[in-house]
Regions:
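RNase H-like, Mg2+-dependent phosphodiesterase core
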Residues: 1-202
Length: 202
């Protein structure tokens, strides 16, 4: 009987030729009021099936952490990168997202020839890309990248919680919860808040 997870590997099976490396790419942190955007790129070995792999947003934190270790140990190559709050402000979130995706890809060895990317917007990667709508749920390489990006960014925001405990970053990871907005009204923004994201508060 075929593993149910194998459905996520259709792109990998179709594209695999044993000689052309390709990666899945995804990001975490486009929407939060605070913190960087993080991207990851992952090249999985041909034939690998990772039980339980799915879009990081559909997984518990405990499951993401377990998958993070499996992906890092199993991947042929992976890259993880950030774009800072300052870069988000200077480039807008779309530009900053592609910046960090390109940084993640550039960190990989062997270098991928093309990428599988979630979404359907214009490709602004430095390599050719195949766009996959809902790719983080449908494509194993993209799902693996989504896990690495999400876990890495969440851990960063946990560290920021120790520096700025009044905002509760460990709980909401910078997203606009009621408690986060209440803390902003009481304490004002921290150095890691995104000014353009806070304009609607005024």
């Amino acid at each position: 009987m075929e593993h149910p997870e194998m459905d996520m590997y259709a792109y990998e099976r179709f594209l695999a030729d044993g000689k052309t490396p390709f990666c899945g790419v995804d990001e975490a942190g486009r929407g939060p009021l605070a913190g960087p955007v993080c991207a990851a790129a992952v090249l999985l070995p041909e034939g690998l099936v990772i039980p339980g792999l799915n879009d990081s947003k559909k997984l518990t934190a405990k499951k993401r952490d377990a998958l993070y270790d499996i992906i890092c140990e199993s991947a042929v190559a992976f890259g993880i990168a950030f774009a800072t709050v300052e870069e988000i402000e200077a480039l807008n979130i779309k530009g900053a997202t592609y910046l960090t995706m390109n940084r993640a890809i550039a960190d990989m060895e062997p270098a991928p020839v093309f990428a599988l990317v979630d979404g359907n917007d214009k490709n602004e990667l430095d390599i050719p890309a195949i766009k996959v709508v809902k790719g983080d749920s449908l494509c194993a390489s993209i799902a693996a990248a989504s896990v690495l990006a999400k876990v890495t960014r969440d851990r960063y925001m946990d560290d920021m919680d120790a520096l700025y405990p009044q905002y509760g970053f460990a709980r909401h990871k910078g997203y606009g919860t009621a408690a986060h907005y209440a803390a902003l009204r009481e304490y004002g923004p921290s150095p890691i808040h995104r000014p353009t994201y806070l304009r609607k508060m005024h």
